[in-house]
Amino acid sequence: MARQALDLFDEGFQELTPSEFFRKNKQMLGFTGKIRSLTIVFHELITNSFDAAEEAGILPEIKIDLKRIGKDHYILRHQDNGPGIPEKYIPKVFCTMFAGSKFRNIQSRGQQGLGCSGCVLLSQMTTGKPVKVISGTMENGELKGVKMTLKMDVKKNQGLILEKEEVEVDGTGVCIELHFKDVSYSLSEQGAYEYIRRTMIANPHARIVFNDPTGNRYVFNRASDVIPPMPKEVLPHPWGVTADDLIFMAKHTDKRRFGSMLKSNLSRMSSMKIKELEELTGIDLNKRPKDMKWEEAEQIVEAFKKMKFMSPPTSGLIPIGEEQIDKGMKEILQPEFTATVTRKPKTYRGGIAFIVEAGIAYGGNSGRLVGDQRKAEIMRFANRVPLTFDAGSCAITEGVKSLDWKRYGIRDLENAPISIFVNVVSTNVPYLSTGKQSVSPEPEILGEIRQATMIVARKLHKYLRKKKAAKEEAQRAKIFESYVPVIIKQAALLAEREEPDYRELLDTVTRRAKLEILGGITE
């Protein structure tokens, strides 16, 4: 006898909390391999520490200890000097999925609200161990410290406090201790060390001390004392909204008229634009927002595309800046030559603002070390965050490799000792997947990546030409210095005269070459 639908649903229908969902789909958090999983953990903890410190006006300082206690089994201790986390928020920060301060339309290193809680979930899934947190905060001018031991209640998507006590702390900040299995530490291009190295190039205002499992201690010193200004929250641009966006705004606004709602919820909207919109659509924008129909919202979106607006405001975009990129590259790579550029803001998909920055470093420790040879490396970033995976599908890789590098004095890009830096800045970086490791090849973004890379490549080409000319001139100078004394001596003998004082003249002829050998390339 066939079973009834109600019986089937009563037995099998379930609801999943976000924690339960990601427990079954941890690959959606980026945890898809031993090396990658550990690198993602480093990424989440470091970016959270940076964001917290910068928002509080503090130069970030982080200490990381990674100890191996078994095969693919590690203890990670991460400590920062940020403002700390108030006691009542600690369980939410570390044990609740989709809880955080990164859900605004603002440029941010993280956007999903999964960072710390995702790391705790991975730790709990692979070891069953709780997370230990020490937080120091300033409350009413008094330094307070609290220590908690927590586990995540996956069913309820919330934290369970196993232990809690007040402790003395040296200053504000957070220290977190996590156990992980099925992860691996590697010095490869995708490993945790390389992630830190690249992070420091894009964040020269930070300092990180890293003690790795092999006993090595790496100190990445601060190259700048300038804290990046905080980006401002920006309103969506009319060219970038959808019918669903408008209906959502209408349901949650406190405005009494749809036109007023548009002016307060969208950038570049004025009374003149509202009047123009009414004329184009024939829709009465004085109606209540909740009375707006889907078909009318679609009409408005189509009308927006026909209207002229100023470009989106760029106050919400904070690039690293040419000087700071240069400082970062020089501190970490110690190159022979650097060039940087920050392009002017552009838009993609009609109304989403973005900025592309590029840098190039040649010689020194530039490039990736393969055996005893240095080869080219493309350092990809989005909002200062290194993208260490999925390079093949990324717009940055495509844009850089699409150049004819022979035109810029690089005959074999793969084997050149150069590091190419590209950072995409936006409130809404178009990632190709939830792993957020590659930028979508939007035509406008791809074009800007090419333009920025060409600018720094031309500067490198100019330097390489000067270097080649200097080398040739130095060789000519050596010939002069070797043969002029002999020629003058023989000429004096033939003429039966004393040798003239030729040294001042010889110095004048060879001075430029000597300067270039001793002091570098000069104009």
Curated annotation (Swiss-Prot):
Homodimer. Heterotetramer of two Top6A and two Top6B chains. The keyword Metal-binding does not apply. It catalyses: ATP-dependent breakage, passage and rejoining of double-stranded DNA. Relaxes both positive and negative superturns and exhibits a strong decatenase activity. It is an enzyme of class 5 (isomerase). CDD domains: HATPase_TopVIB-like, TopoIIB_Trans. Belongs to the TOP6B family. This is Type 2 DNA topoisomerase 6 subunit B. It comes from Methanothermobacter thermautotrophicus (strain ATCC 29096 / DSM 1053 / JCM 10044 / NBRC 100330 / Delta H). One of its GO terms (biological process) is DNA topological change. SUPFAM superfamilies: ATPase domain of HSP90 chaperone/DNA topoisomerase II/histidine kinase, Ribosomal protein S5 domain 2-like, S13-like H2TH domain.
